[in-house]
């Protein structure tokens, strides 16, 4: 079972993610560890039946013990922690809702199912950083994904 850290799980994006993961029973397949930037030491949520205390989201040693980090904490957190963690030699998977890493060569924007092939290729080729896309663009591409996949779009114009 993978150790998966969650940072930013209380906000709008994170709370929707938690709800969806509970509904899909995703917590049954992982060991979740919940982190906080402001409430460390308090009781962690009990998603999936886990208990414990909130860990310090700035503790690099605690973060390095994780196989996967899922963060919805925002760009400032990502900009501070991500480079330090990678420079320390951490080889885990970083999954981020923030825009900070979108243009990095070693990151893939998650837009499943539109780019499932790109995600799969990235995983097979050692990519370990996955980021969310711009909400408006993502929704548009997801709604048009089937049309693109079936070569039914000649051109797109944006005003």
Model-derived regions: residue spans:
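N-terminal Rossmann-like NAD(P) cofactor-binding subdomain of oxidoreductases
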Residues: 1-159
């Amino acid at each position: 079972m993978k150790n998966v850290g969650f940072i930013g799980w209380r906000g709008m994006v994170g709370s929707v993610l938690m709800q969806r993961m509970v509904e899909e029973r995703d917590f049954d397949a992982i060991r979740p560890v919940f982190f906080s930037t402001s409430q460390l030491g308090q009781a962690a949520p009990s998603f999936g039946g886990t208990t414990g205390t909130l860990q310090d989201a700035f503790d690099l040693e605690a973060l390095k013990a994780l196989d996967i980090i899922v963060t919805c904490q925002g760009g400032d957190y990502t900009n501070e922690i991500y480079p330090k963690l990678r420079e320390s030699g951490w080889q885990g998977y970083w999954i981020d809702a923030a825009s900070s890493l979108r243009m990095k060569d070693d990151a893939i924007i998650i837009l499943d199912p539109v780019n499932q092939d790109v995600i799969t290729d990235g995983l097979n080729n050692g990519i370990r950083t996955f980021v969310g896309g711009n909400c408006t663009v993502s929704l548009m591409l997801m709604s048009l994904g089937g049309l693109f996949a079936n070569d039914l779009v000649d051109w797109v114009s944006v005003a």
